[in-house]
Swiss-Prot record:
Its EC number is 3.6.4.-. Residues 72-309 form the Helicase ATP-binding domain. One of its GO terms (molecular function) is helicase activity. Residues 195-215, 678-841 are annotated as: Disordered. A motif (DEAD box) lies at residues 266-269. Residues 413-450 form a coiled coil. It comes from the Viruses. It comes from Acanthamoeba polyphaga mimivirus. Residues 698-725 have a biased composition (Basic and acidic residues). Keywords: ATP-binding, Coiled coil, Helicase, Hydrolase, Metal-binding, Nucleotide-binding, Zinc, Zinc-finger. This is Putative helicase R592. A zinc finger (RING-type) spans 451-491.
Length: 841
């Protein structure tokens, strides 16, 4: 049986008896069946493995005959495996169901040692304890306790130090003695109670002696009580252990080594399993959604004990359902995904290729102090990053020049080798000087704010992704049209507007078409913290009960953005502290007392159940595996409503999305209504639709957002247009408007009607903006409602003598315009409509 890709055709078990009001899903029953079979047979059969497979890479070197290898059947004997269902699939309940099905799994012979010709197995006569040891991270122990309370299992929670008193005797003494083997600790009491049974060596005496005895230090001594230990083992099915308390746990059970029924470690990929961990059971289970990561964490020593260095064989030890089967079994509501592009510092944008990825990640998270520390800089400014980068090159240059001077003073034994060494050093010196000169030129170009093309101060400065050169946006667009869509500096082909980045320059702002970005605040011109403030403020005003999770890899990030979060008038908290404090914070969040919960993804990115949240914000991009874990905190078993996932990304961060939902770009504050009311959005366009249809969708989104924001203004405009139309009706002759330059106008309209999208997207738009200002051309924006909508059959004449009639506004046209907006019929989105432009009266 294959345990790696379980599906609906795989065997299932019946609902385990002992779960209170919890019915397991089909995929969970399938996992329990596979886990029970693996525990029973303790072996995995591999029949006729392929040459070149991971199994062949691991064991093929032991077999010289390839034909024998291909035709053979292999058996892996194991007492350890990994439950690796996807994030949020309910692995905790699956594990509890496994224990309820069989409290103690079958014991198997243990391989001790051997060679190719013999092996030694141990048939152990030692019986295991009827207790399942579950080791969990400190932030999940109360969550596990809540799940165990929903079953009939009897468990002992070992979280605080006082929980271990169930195994100990405690007495109080005034004098410290060396600890015996049965004694665990002897510590002084800080707050001495009034009445305490203290053992003293002397009795009686004067009042002064008694007073001196009262002033003596009192020590609390803890000793093992074997009867209490035995009683705890006999009366409990599960020991629930905080991984941070393992040292104390080991002290108690080290004197008499125990063999457990099962050892289960939750979140094996992120749990801080200590190096001294040495617990085994009849069968060992590790729970994680990312099994490949267990070799890279602090538990690597324990994992290597079990699996050795056979990482290629890891999939054979994994019990996992197919993700399609899990999705079908759970039927979770599909999340809405939003992308908000924010502004990165201009200097960082230019030199992002020279900044280490680790430091760039810190900058993206807003953790500039840590970024400066990584670069050995003292002051928190972007300019210092450039100084450090040039300083490293200067240091390398100095070392090379010193080495060249040293080599020149040597008396060579091999002249050719000596000359080659000098030549290599000189080439490296030239490389450093060129690199340093290039950086200085870029710095001067930014500080002087002078365009290479027009030699004037920058207007809408734009950085090329190919060579990091900076130009005015207008100069760049003009040059791209004349030289054939190539970079003016390095001649690299420019295929779309993604090949360059428009950045802010002091007080100037990016001039974009109103149809592209509508709103008071354009997010690509704002700092990430300010954008977060706008998003939270909008949610606060338009959602009665917001529950928001904000994740970042760094705790220092939250120190910076707390001021912005506070301005949103929402109650917020940072998740940290003891398990009891964490549980209280989560309870307040679920009850709506706290609206925003800030979490460090490194500490709380896995394991927690936070499906009550309706918004999840990733403040910066993380590792793909970690992002999956983070989103799984809310998108998991038990969720009923659609989750809104918001990615906040800078220009240098990737925009890939591993979720099934297609990301929706939020460009300004006027489009934030899509976050709070995602159900008003139309269905996604077909995959076959081209870029033109996507642009129409974006325009329709902008149209609805602008209409929604300025409805009062539209009413007044409609009234004025109605008055104009009534005046036109009174006149017998039709009114015609002739453009200033009919040739240019007809050519311009003809070009847009043909949907010539072979040109650069974004470049022609910017150019059209300049032309539209001169000719009075309106784009397909909110202003076009004053003139009505052109149908597909309407044609615009190309001749100089042609005149364009202004269509009359009627009720039919107003109804059709409403359908074109987001939230209307789906047909209008799926059909590719040409972009119409009208002549202003």
């Amino acid at each position: 049986m294959s345990f790696f890709e379980l599906d609906e055709n795989s065997p299932k078990v019946d609902q385990p008896h002992g779960l209170k009001k919890v019915k397991l899903k089909d995929h969970q029953l399938t996992s329990i069946a596979a886990m029970r079979e693996l525990e029973t047979q303790a072996s995995i059969v591999i029949d006729k493995p392929e040459i070149g497979s991971k199994f062949h890479a691991s064991v093929g070197y032991c077999i010289s005959d390839i034909e024998e290898f291909k035709d053979s059947t292999f058996v892996i004997e194991t007492n350890s495996a990994i439950l690796a269902d996807k994030v949020g699939a309910g692995k905790t309940y699956t594990t509890i169901g496994l224990i309820l099905k069989a409290l103690v799994p079958k014991a198997h012979d243990r391989h001790i040692t051997g060679t190719d010709n013999f092996s030694i197995k141990m048939i152990s006569a030692k019986e295991c304890e009827p207790v399942n040891l579950i080791v969990v991270p400190h932030n999940l122990i109360n969550q596990w306790a809540d799940f165990l309370d929903k079953s009939k299992l009897k468990y002992l929670k070992l979280n605080a130090e006082s929980d271990f008193n169930a195994f100990l005797d405690i007495d109080y003494i005034t004098k410290v003695y060396p600890l015996t083997r049965e004694q665990i600790s002897c510590k002084p009491i800080k707050n001495k109670p009034k009445k305490l049974p203290v053992k003293t060596t002397k009795k009686g005496g004067s009042k002064t002696q008694n007073k001196a005895q009262n002033d003596q230090k009192i020590y609390e001594r803890k000793s093992l009580n074997m009867k209490k230990i035995r009683q705890a083992l006999d009366t409990h099915n599960v020991f629930l252990l905080n991984v941070y308390r393992y040292k104390l746990f080991r002290q108690i059970f080290l004197t008499n080594k125990r063999k457990w029924a099962r050892v289960i470690i939750d979140e094996m990929d992120s749990s801080a399993v200590p190096s001294i961990f040495d617990e085994y059971g009849n069968f060992n289970w590790f729970l994680t959604a990312t099994p490949s990561a267990i070799f890279n964490r602090s538990c690597r020593r324990y994992v290597n004990k079990i699996f050795g260095q056979r990482q290629n064989l890891l999939n054979y030890f994994v019990v996992k359902n197919k993700e399609e089967y899990v999705d079908k079994s759970m039927i979770l509501p599909k999340p809405f995904v939003f992308m908000i592009n924010t502004m990165i510092q201009r200097v960082v944008a230019v030199f992002k290729d020279l900044i280490p990825q680790e430091v760039l990640q810190l900058i993206n998270s807003g953790n500039m102090k840590e970024a400066i520390t990584k670069l050995n800089c003292d002051v928190d400014t972007e300019e210092n990053i450039i100084k450090i980068l040039t300083g490293k090159i200067n240091t390398e240059l100095h070392n090379l020049e010193t080495e060249l001077e040293y080599v020149n003073n040597l008396i060579p034994q091999d002249v050719d080798a000596h000359e080659n060494r000098k030549k290599n050093i000189m080439n490296n010196i030239a490389r450093c000087k060129t690199k340093l000169e290039s950086i200085k030129e870029k710095i001067n170009s930014i500080k002087d704010e002078c365009c290479f093309i027009c030699t004037d101060p920058f207007e809408n400065p734009t950085i090329m992704n190919c060579c990091k050169s900076i130009f005015c946006l207008k100069c760049l667009l003009t040059t791209l049209k004349t030289v054939g869509s190539k970079c003016p500096y390095c001649r690299h082909a420019i295929k779309s507007n993604k090949d360059y980045q428009i950045i802010s320059s002091g007080g100037t702002s990016n001039k974009k078409k109103k149809s592209e970005i509508v709103g008071k605040y354009k997010f690509n011109e704002m700092d990430k913290a300010d954008v977060l403030e706008q998003v939270l403020s909008y949610i606060s005003k338009n959602d009665e009960n917001p529950k928001i999770l904000i994740f970042s890899d760094y705790s220092q990030t939250f120190e910076k953005i707390t001021k912005n979060i506070a301005k949103a008038n929402l109650q917020y908290a940072y998740l940290s502290g003891t398990p009891a404090h964490i549980t209280n914070l989560i309870t307040e969040f679920e009850n709506g007392i706290t609206n925003i919960l800030m979490l460090n993804s490194q500490n709380f990115g896995s394991g927690l159940n936070l499906q009550s949240a309706n918004y999840l914000i990733l403040y910066h991009r993380m590792l793909p595996e970690l992002e999956t874990q983070v989103i799984g905190r809310a998108q998991r078993f038990g969720r009923k409503n659609n989750l809104r996932v918001i990615f906040m990304v800078n220009d240098n961060e990737n925009r890939d999305c591993r979720l099934d939902s297609k990301p929706i770009n939020i460009l300004s504050d006027s489009e934030l209504w899509m976050i709070t009311n995602p159900t008003d959005l139309n269905e996604e366009p077909d995959e076959e639709s081209d870029e033109g249809s996507d642009e129409d969708v974006e325009k329709s989104k902008d149209k609805k957002s602008s209409d929604k924001k300025s409805s009062d203004k539209k009413k007044s405009e409609k009234k004025s247009s109605d008055k104009k139309s009534s005046n036109k009706k009174n006149s017998k002759k039709k009114t015609y408007v002739k453009p200033k330059s009919s040739k240019k106008t007809s050519q311009k309209v003809k070009k847009t009607d043909s949907d010539n999208e072979s040109e650069l997207s974004g470049l022609s738009d910017s150019d059209d903006l300049d032309d539209s200002d001169d000719l009075g051309i309106l784009s397909d924006s909110s202003d076009s409602d004053d003139f009505g909508n052109l149908s597909d059959s309407d044609d615009l004449s190309d001749s100089d003598e042609s005149e364009i009639e202004i269509p009359k506004k009627s009720k039919k046209t107003s109804k059709s315009s409403k359908k074109n907006k987001i939230g209307g019929s789906n047909k209008t989105l799926k059909k590719k409509a040409p972009v119409r432009k009208l002549i202003k009266v």
